[in-house]
């Protein structure tokens, strides 16, 4: 069993909640880079299944960045008016041959094409923190990772670098021919 999926492989992405219940499943993403510490994937118009069984289809191409050491993942959505980012505060990913998996910890940061951003779902986070008994150590890790993400946004680091999404989107297009 490999510690990560191979480049070009089609995988599912599974998001869970802290209590172990499935939160959301993305049916098909193509792996553009796969290492034991970082997976970069892409999808476009992929089926997403919610925990309650409802489904929807993503509207635009997206580049997805997952890391084994950071408590967040970053989705760059390519739209006509520019790149929007959706950052999920989450556990580092694991790969188990069935899917790329992570725990979603409610807090999100939405980043606009001009690199302004908003922190979302703080109320949901506090509610779930109590309901699911998030340990204090997880609370500290997540709050530190919010600061790290904001720093990355300001520094245009990682997926926020000016050419990052374009570079990986070009690679994604090469698989679609």
Swiss-Prot record:
GO molecular-function term, one example from the UniProt record: magnesium ion binding
E.C. designation(s): 3.6.1.15, 3.6.1.6
KW Transport (keyword) present: no
Keyword Magnesium: yes
Superkingdom of the organism of origin: Bacteria
InterPro entries per UniProt: DUF402, FomD-like_sf, Ntdp-like, SA1684
Class in the EC hierarchy, top level: hydrolase
Record: residues binding Mg(2+) 1: 88, 104, 108
Alphabetical UniProt keywords: Hydrolase, Magnesium, Metal-binding
Catalytic activity: a ribonucleoside 5'-triphosphate + H2O = a ribonucleoside 5'-diphosphate + phosphate + H(+); a ribonucleoside 5'-diphosphate + H2O = a ribonucleoside 5'-phosphate + phosphate + H(+)
Cofactor(s) of this protein: Mg(2+)
Active site residues according to the UniProt entry: 24
Binding-site positions, Mg(2+) 2: 106, 108, 121, 124
Similarity field: Belongs to the Ntdp family.
Role this protein plays: Has nucleoside phosphatase activity towards nucleoside triphosphates and nucleoside diphosphates.
PANTHER family named in the record: PTHR39159, UPF0374 PROTEIN YGAC
HAMAP family in UniProt: Ntdp (MF_01568)
The protein, known as: Nucleoside triphosphate/diphosphate phosphatase
Organism in which the protein naturally occurs: Geobacillus sp. (strain WCH70)
